[in-house]
């Protein structure tokens, strides 16, 4: 396949020159063969995972890839965080053979939220993880509602895609619950750390009726146990619920009767690990 050969050559040259050649390889490939991503991604044998959200994308995506590889699975992954169209194309191209053939059980793809418009219709993910939606997005897209509208549209365009969502984030949970797609949730049902009163909170108002949300408690930012006093929209009961969470030099918690200990710091990594566990559990149930 000419597109694959040309892209691999570009990637090799850029690497030799000490430059990051990943996105250039993808750009060349899609210029020569506009449907190359469809051709390559369709060869993934078991499932394609797509990870989106303001925070935790790269960590969770790489964590999932490592977990699958530890089980002996062959995985395509955009490890470097090149999460726009060219970077995703490059991940598939560089994982393929010179003839365009791919031998992979899974693909773990981190996707920029705005770029899902160009990525999802091509790869049609089997699973989509939505980690959270924070103010970060406002710097690039103007309004967080724009990001939500894009993701909502992509959920409709891939109706069989199962959504794995952080139920502690009202914005993310709203998207999943109103999407019509199958979805599962993860969360932390008891307060663990003290949340600052002056933190910026994006999900202050109910996306269904506009009423100000009430919170039984916050974890941090807008993550917590929320409910709408007017229409009844509320945090869903998590399918995967982290209990007995301890934060220190290591993280530890219990989920589904298992005690998890991880060499990570930072409370937010409990969410990343939970998402990864739910990803792999859900995929295993489908096999």
Task: Give the residues covered by each predicted segment.
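Phosphate-binding loop of NTP-binding sites
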Residues: 2-187, 195-205, 278-279
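Short glycine/threonine-rich catalytic loop with a Thr-x-Gly-x-Asp
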Residues: 201, 264-275
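Short amphipathic beta-strand/extended segments with alternating polar/hydrophobic composition
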Residues: 185, 238-240, 256-265
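Short amphipathic alpha-helical segments and their helix-coil junctions
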Residues: 5-13, 250-262
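Acidic-glycine-rich active-site phosphate/pyrophosphate-binding loop
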Residues: 58-67, 244-257
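A short glycine/serine-rich beta->alpha loop
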Residues: 74-79, 259-267
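Single conserved hydrophobic/aromatic residue that forms the stacking wall/gate
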Residues: 279-287
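Cys/His-rich short segments
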Residues: 191-248
